[in-house]
């Protein structure tokens, strides 16, 4: 039977295809299939949870039975012994029976207590790994997410406008390089992010903790970066940064990614009621610049090159735009506001001007008493101008939810801005900087600063225009050159140079909202930090009492009253 009979039918057919999307090959198959064994266990457990539990029945007899029940949900973890120096994992068949590290020779287990009745080996150090395969399978088992896992097919129509990584040049290049992987739209594309933070607060003992997250790019923009779709794979514990040893920590994750790429895993699609082989690929990593040095260390070949497709990626690492923007703004506000100790226009900077630049009007003027006078620069505000800006920021108000209270970052006594978070700098750079400095700086200074504000505003737009990014690739170089004519050489560190690479990454990788660390990744890290602090507050007092009373340590006598409960047997006197 002929579907398109005439011109009217052809137009109608084209309209339906444009509205609903063309049918893909993965829809052609059995109308319905039974779930595989893993999916059936998952559905049976969900069904059992709906059944009323009688009074005489119990959920589980012991803790071991409860753990077995939870493992069916895909919430299990792997406990892996690791060398005390973080140089080797005891987790494969060849290394499980080893008792010492083959790299450094350190013992795997703690020394045995000969007086103990049970002689059980206790590892000196362990790590916990959360597998990603069961969680990816659950995205297809749940009817709330399974329909959205193939959304990325619908966002590739306009070649100049990119609203999602699926429409980017990097995604299309990957599909062209690996057509077999691209033929199955249900295959998963992932992004990996990590960043270090101190779980005990900024003013506590220095400690660096590195959570490793994965996000799923198959989902539409409104779901892609939500915290419920960001998976924690493991936490690299401190107290120091892992450095190049992070490759050892990532070994289980890389092996699982290789298995998902090579063989895949049988997964049940609850929407189409089909079993299929799901594969996954890691498109890129995301971190700030110090994290880039940790992830893609320059002293050896990093572990990501073990992935068979890693060499074919156009972008292997994404510079975090928000951190680049914050560092850029910090240099601007500290120099323009003449923040003592933070400004880039200090005495050493003026000496550099004398050595490397032909700007005699800014050179230090020596005096007879040995003190040099620093001439006023056109890019530095006077005290009265700084007072006006600080007062304006102090009284500035925004709509609810638009921005945080920037008044808390204003110090009226010292006339400086302090404690600005990444989101504060993001808003100040794009919205407030051109307004704040317009009446106080000359056009030769205010103009390039405004161009930088427009640059970051275009860069962080929800819809990336490829032609616009190509324009900014050339224009940002001119803007940096204009700034070099104004500010001293000390103003330009590595962060100012990194801005030149950001338009290319946006053009190739798509909108930066899917490739930066802020908001959702930091929310997940913040939740971890809050949980650690709550646990510390609950467990510290019992630990402190037990440690002081144990007698294992020499304790200052002044600590004993802190762990001694009040005495109820006290003398009572009558009062008048």
Residue spans for each PLM region:
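A structural signal for the principal folded core domain
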Residues: 1-576
